[in-house]
Amino acid sequence: MINKNDIVADVVTDYPKAADIFRSVGIDFCCGGQISIEAASLEKKNVDLNELLQRLNDIEQTNTPGSLNPKFLNVSSLIQYIQAAYHEPLREEFKNLTPYVTKLSKVHGPNHPYLVELKETYDTFKNGMLEHMQKEDDVDFPKLIKYEQGEVVDDINTVIDDLVSDHIATGQLLVKMSDLTSSYEPPIVACGTWRLVYQRLKALEVLTHEHVHLENHVLFKKVS
């Protein structure tokens, strides 16, 4: 049974669908997830702790038998899972979404300057993530696999610390984009492209939070 003293990130690790519940009430399960459910609920207004626990325990009871929980994968398999489920989809989405973000800024930015700032923030986020994921694939993940296999990797703690720092910076950019877009709520005057960009940026935020959680709270714990 999930209780108020359980750590937010650990609950999401054990029950991945709990991420949807925490997200719905604005609780960070990613870089800020190392606090208890009770402490996290106290940081938010209008979050009833008992109701939150009930929703979480409903998920526990309905957890689908046989569904894949990445926490049970070894380091090599988990890395392959992360690359297939997050790295490749993110690269593809960046390629497809960027022209729409650019168009939105160009067409509506002159009358809505925050859309220009949104594009600049998105570009920083995109370029940072692309560089970060490539470095993980080429340099960092092979080191984690070597460490799992018993080889000596002198800088393993530095590798993890640097990746976590990158994740924190990524989280800050996501917060900024969410703030600029009023949590991705398009204004009444928004055209189809505007609404499309907001919808896909929100989905990108969800994917990135899940991605970072899996690395910070599952993968890195296996090698630290």
Swiss-Prot record:
Q: Where is the signal peptide?
A: none
Give a single Pfam family match.
Hemerythrin
Q: Which GO terms describe its biological process?
A: protein repair; response to nitrosative stress; response to oxidative stress
Q: Does the keyword Ribonucleoprotein apply?
A: no
Role this protein plays: Di-iron-containing protein involved in the repair of iron-sulfur clusters damaged by oxidative and nitrosative stress conditions.
Q: How does it assemble?
A: Homodimer.
| The species this protein was found in | Staphylococcus aureus (strain bovine RF122 / ET3-1)
Concerning InterPro entries, the annotation shows:
Hemerythrin-like, RIC_family, ScdA, ScdA-like_N_sf
The organism's superkingdom is given as Bacteria
Keyword Glycosyltransferase in annotation: no
UniProt protein name: Iron-sulfur cluster repair protein ScdA
Q: Which GO terms describe its molecular function?
A: metal ion binding
Listed GO CC annotations: cytoplasm
Keyword list (alphabetical) reads:
Cytoplasm, Iron, Metal-binding, Stress response
Family to which this protein belongs: Belongs to the RIC family. ScdA subfamily.
What are the subcellular locations of this protein?
A: Cytoplasm
